[in-house]
Amino acid sequence: MTTELLDRILSPADLRQLDRRELKRLADELRGFVLESVSRTGGHLSSNLGTVELSLALHYVFDTPHDRIVWDVGHQSYPHKILTGRREGMAHLRQQGGISGFPKRSESEYDAFGTAHSSTSISAALGMAVASRNAGVQRQHIAVIGDGAMSAGMAFEAMNNAGVTPNINLLVVLNDNDMSISPPVGALNRYLARLMSGQFYAAAKNVGRAVLQHVPPVLELARRLEEHAKGMVTPATLFEEFGFNYVGPIDGHDLDALVPTLQNLRALPGLQFLHVVTRKGQGYKLAEADPVLYHGPGKFDPAVGIQQAKAPARKTFTQVFGQWLCDMAERDERLVGITPAMREGSGLVEFEQRFPQRYFDVGIAEQHAVTFAAGLACEGQKPVVAIYSTFLQRGYDQLVHDVALQNLDVTFALDRAGLVGADGATHAGNYDIAFLRCVPNMVVAAPSDESEARLLLSTCYEHPGPASVRYPRGAGCGAAVGEGLATVPLGKGLVRREGRRIAILGFGTLVQAALGAAGQIDATVADMRFVKPLDRELVLELAARHDALVTVEEAAIMGGAGSAVLETLAEAGVTLPVLQLGLPDAFIDHGDQAALLAGLGLDAAGIERAIRARFGALLA
């Protein structure tokens, strides 16, 4: 693959030196480079193949980094990164010490705002626009947001606020990759986009509105006629009701449409809204045919595509959950499965196929997902909310106010708890223990392996109140998983290994690492199973017959399971040395999960080192 033009682009300033006729060729080179690069490292592919032309056009037209571009979610920002001087860094994308898979302010001045969670771009760009206005700085502010992210309430909250904010420059680009434009409509839309984004049209519309303001009935008639005319070839004028000048839809892969339209919009003050239609996987037929499969692939050969992987020897926790959900739904017809746009990631594909009437993908709407579950529970249903730990943060008020306060029977299956690897700090599920254990009525369970995951899911489901089960990304230790739906006593742990002098209290999958360390120092190991209700009896019994305790968790130490143990000891008046091991008060960057844990001293060797360093005298 030749990259003659791409080789000349070290920054957007170089891009803007090109003749516009060269952009199509550059787009082909950039798309080919994205495909080759991601196939070697893994990462998000379909979305990035779909934003090549849009990225080129934005940096070609706008004066970045002076003008601000905010990429919503950000997993579609690889072309942007390549065009802004990080082409060489793509070789280590999402690897420890390498560049992030998302925009990151500390990585480049072109990353105006850090993103990874959805629907934040318009709010951030609006804040920047107001700051520029207040400082007397003339610049453009662009929020690029996908059709999925646009469905979330936060995006509409931002547009509502923008509509009453005077004297700002804000362009929202809706990257719509869930529809297509037929050639005839596309040609007409391209013409209309140029017309509606032009200064004459904008000026004429504003003058006409000012004149007709004195004749309200005529103004209303003119407004309706304009909406009717545009409605023949464009979506409803919802966005104009927020005060935006709506333009589009136009083909997001047609640079001859994108560039002049953006140039026109750049010259217009105020609120502008450009609707572009793109195709996920554009230019790579395999990804076009199955954009979900190629959404976030690992390494693969582009010539043959992603091959069917051999069944792994060990099940992932997501698979264990998915099978449990189907089995429990077979037994209990009250069970309802809910996910906020994470069907594949949370393991609900089979559940949707088998129980379509009881499956609800509510879209990127975590707040709604939680309160929707609360409403179901009020009427005797048994909702299970399958959600990533990091995304539950977005529904926290609803969890407290709508579920826990009313003690409603809702089960939360928290996937990606702890470190998540390549996605990094933005997706890490490090905080759920701390923010859940302080909520009255809430149960917090942390299984140590696949078998325990099934047991604790059943236990929490049968509990008549709010409950959560947290489990990590990836495979477990290979524990055999039964087919039954047995439960265990709520709030009771068990001793997995008897030792001397030191007892390790493990919460979650780090119990396995604790067992490895204990074998070297002859320590007792308890699988605590529950952070809340904590097995107070077991904690005090272990404290009574050991000289020191160690708590281990893949979660934030501050406010975590170790804190619960310390609170129990203090309440009982027990004075005993306690070593807390877990995630530090810091955001952990991206990298391999196992390597990150080892670097934090949370593998077997690291746990042993920490215990020897703190309690060496007890081991002599």
From Swiss-Prot:
Top-level EC class: transferase
GO MF, any single term: 1-deoxy-D-xylulose-5-phosphate synthase activity
One example of a Gene Ontology biological process annotation: terpenoid biosynthetic process
Transmembrane annotation, as ranges: none
Family: Belongs to the transketolase family. DXPS subfamily.
Role noted for this protein: Catalyzes the acyloin condensation reaction between C atoms 2 and 3 of pyruvate and glyceraldehyde 3-phosphate to yield 1-deoxy-D-xylulose-5-phosphate (DXP).
Identification of the protein by name: 1-deoxy-D-xylulose-5-phosphate synthase
